Amino acid sequence: LIFGRAGLGVVSLGFGGPLGPEAPLIALVAQLSSRLSHILRVTQARVVELSVAGSLGVLFGVPLVLAGIESEEKSKNRNIGQRIVARGPEILAAISSLFVITKLLPEIGIHQFTSVNSAEVGFGIDLIWVALIALLAASLGLAIVRATPKARELVVSKIPGGAIPAGLLSGLILGASAVVTPLVLFSGHHEIQEILDSTIGIGNLLVVVALKTLVLIACLAGGWYGGQIFPLAFIGAGTALVVAELVNSSATLGLVAAGFVAASAVGIRRPALALLLGFVLFPATTWIPMLFATVIAVAVIGKRSAELPSH
């Protein structure tokens, strides 16, 4: 079972599935690390949390362990030194993932998104576009998260034969969409840079975003195994480019960063993690729009939390 899910994830990604690699990695690491809790004398949930965060840090090229993890021994009365000691396991896990990134796998590096002709987001009209993009991207992320389990229920109830026919049908949808545009294939991480570099028009961008949304829901509903962080980020980035083209804004990269963070934050319900990924993958000139987008995403999550399915 441990390696079955990981193998399914590899197959899904290898055949162009519009999903991220984090889900099979999480499944594998969580199962393996849970068996170490009695050796380390730490609760099973704690070991899994730290191990998953450490492995994701290596996957994304940045130590993520300290992002959004709360100590199980937290207390308002502790001083700074005691808090640091209590967070010792997170700190060690972060150092371990940083060592792997820099020493053992230096070639993965950190490759930031770029846009040659992009200007910085100003404090005037550009922030209005940031707010609009963040709201649109967060709403799209929310719609996808809500639609996926419903689509899965529909597939299970309406398609006879179990997993194989469901997988074939979703594969046909993915293949047909890829004929229209290959940008819908794979997670969307590298494809974000492609749409930043391309000169495709508004109509084509809308088609790409719509098809990416369709294949993401279809493949998850059809039993393909993978993560949603970068597919959602791609959808948010594509939405931002559509708005940037419509309003003729030159602050392309900042707007894309806002869409990236807003959509992924709502999708994974971890705004701090989405923001940290944005900080790593986008230059410092885009940090203000990303912070603004995170605030909007948090508001959307808070308002619609009851409607979001649990992880």
What is each stretch, according to the model?
Residues L1-H311:
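Alpha-helical transmembrane segments and immediately membrane-proximal extracytoplasmic
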